[in-house]
Amino acid sequence: MVLQKSGSRNEEQVKVRGFDSRQVPVYFDGVPIYVPYDGNLDLARILTNNLGAVEVSKGYSSLLQGPNQMGGAINITTQKPTKPLEASLGYRQGWSRSQDNAYDMHASFAASSDLGYLQVSGSQLKQDFLGLPHGVNNDIAGKHGKMINSSADDKRGIVKLGFTPRENDEYTLTYIKQDGEKDNPPYSGNSGQKITLLAVARV
C-alpha cells in the first residue's frame, strides 16, 4: 500500500498493488466516500481523531460493499464507546520556523448501555502555512519561511447512534458533516514530474 500526493489538485491518494482509488474504494463506517467528478478522494482531508481502525482488504472483498473493487477496499471506522459515559477534549499546536502555523482541536461525548450507544464529536484542523527550509526565499516557493498558497482548513462533525439488541448484532445510523478548504502551492522545481512519495506501508 502506497500513499502519494499527485495530480493538478495535489491530492493525497492511496494505491494498493498498483490500483488507485477508482479500483480501491474508500469507505467511512461502511459508506463509500469519493468525488463524483472523477471518483478520487483527497485522503488528507480526513481528520484522524475519533477513528477506531483502518481495514484494508486486498484482492477479494465482499460484493455487499458495491462495485469498483478490482484492487480491494479500504474501510475507515470510528471509535465506539466502551463506558457508560465518555468525554474527551483535546488541542494541539503546531510550530514552524518559530511561528505558530497550525492547530488541531477536537471534542467528543458518548453514552452507552446494553441496548446501544450515542456518540457526538467535532473537530477542526487549520493550517496557516507550511514551513520552508532555511535558505529558500523566492517568489515561487515563498518567503520568510512560509510556503505560499499552503493553507488548509478542515472541519468535521459526527453524530452516531448505535443499536445493539444482541451480542453479535449492531445497527448504526451515522450523520457526518465535513467542510474542507485548501490552497494549492505552485510547483517550484525544475522537473516535469510532480509526484512526491510520502510513505510505503505493508499490510
PLM features: what roles do these ranges have?
Residues 1-31, 52:
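Extracytoplasmic beta-strand/coil segments of soluble accessory domains associated
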Residues 6, 66-68, 94-103:
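Solvent-exposed loop/turn segments connecting transmembrane beta-strands
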Residues 10-12, 22-24, 42, 50-52, ...:
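Envelope-exposed proteins and targeting segments
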Residues 15, 31-59:
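Short acidic/polar hinge/loop motifs at secondary-structure boundaries
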Residues 18-20, 28-30, 58, 78-80, ...:
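Flexible glycine-/small-residue-rich
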